[in-house]
């Protein structure tokens, strides 16, 4: 009765892309290869220019390598944003990669970083939980909805550096677990089908 819209369908598929990410994450080795993974994009909300400025605000002796993921075919645009500041070749801009490669990048990061002015949902944070990584992120409402022991917020440079420094010295506090979203999804499906 609740699925009347689909009454003529033989099959109803309700996709959830996190299940694919989680399935791969569950069989991917988690390591700390010592890099900061910035999951970003080129949209205005991602504020990539400011994120790169934050990275270069870290004193050089405390800066770990940075990998920037999520800009697809905009690698050249990201290199222009970096604008010759990467004198020690510590930044790698990653173009399009497979989901397996994305999960591996998360799984091997020291810290996952999500810098944004606005999001509809904190996907990067959810994915970091699935790979048992600490997250450094801007204090925006979509990210605060993902609050957990592995999430460290910042609103300004000094807070960014304080949390970055803490995370460099401390291992992740997260254990493998099911996302709250998965539990809610399963609960709602039970309501529909029971």
Regions found by a protein language model. Give the residues of each.
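Glycosyltransferase donor-sugar binding loop
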Residues: 18, 39, 65-79, 95-96
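Conserved donor-binding/catalytic core segment of Leloir-type glycosyltransferases
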Residues: 29-46, 52-55, 67
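Short alpha-helical donor nucleotide-sugar binding micro-motif in glycosyltransferases
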Residues: 97, 104-109
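Short hydrophobic beta-strand element within catalytic cores of glycosyltransferases
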Residues: 134-137
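A short, active-site helix/loop in glycosyltransferases that binds the activated sugar's phosphate group
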Residues: 1-9
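Nucleotide-activated donor-binding/catalytic signature segment of Leloir-type glycosyltransferases, i.e.
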Residues: 79-100
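Aromatic "clamp/platform" in nucleotide-sugar-dependent glycosyltransferases that forms part
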Residues: 115-117
